[in-house]
Amino acid sequence: VYYDLYVVLDIFSRFVVAFTVAASEDSLLAKELLEQAMGVHGIPDVVHADRGTSMTSKPVAQLLVDLGVTRSHSRPRVSNDNPYSESAFKTLKYAPAFPDTFGSLADARAFADRFFGYYNHEHRHCGIGLHTPASVHYGTATEIRAQRQATLDAAYTANPTRFRHRPPTPPKLPTIAW
């Protein structure tokens, strides 16, 4: 038995703004998930999606047109057209706790709840300066980066010979998604 995982991902912060697990692909469920995500996090300028039947459906297309959102879809038969989403799904599938099978739809949903809580609030992502998606999404990453810089400055001041050539700096924050 396979279940379908729907994920709405903010590609700038890598924050999963909404998700659900369903027994089958459903265009109305995809539309409802997008409405939920946009109701909480605002209406984006662009929604980039795969070419699955639910994301190319009339209900989803009409919702995006009504909201003035530009639709963008992956190229046909190009699996790596959305590296942000691909990275999130790889992190999910390679998580040590990812089971071989789910006993039920409820089990799959419970796993998704736990995983995306971890992913958003604990997982340090190299593409966003080793911050959590939540810290970038909610704007606390700049302060955290400043604290990291202060720690590195203190380490450099205490022992400059430990560092070659120049003082260390923390990884940079993203400035633009695409």
For every predicted segment, state its role.
Residues V1-W178:
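Charged DNA-binding/catalytic regions of mobile-element recombinases
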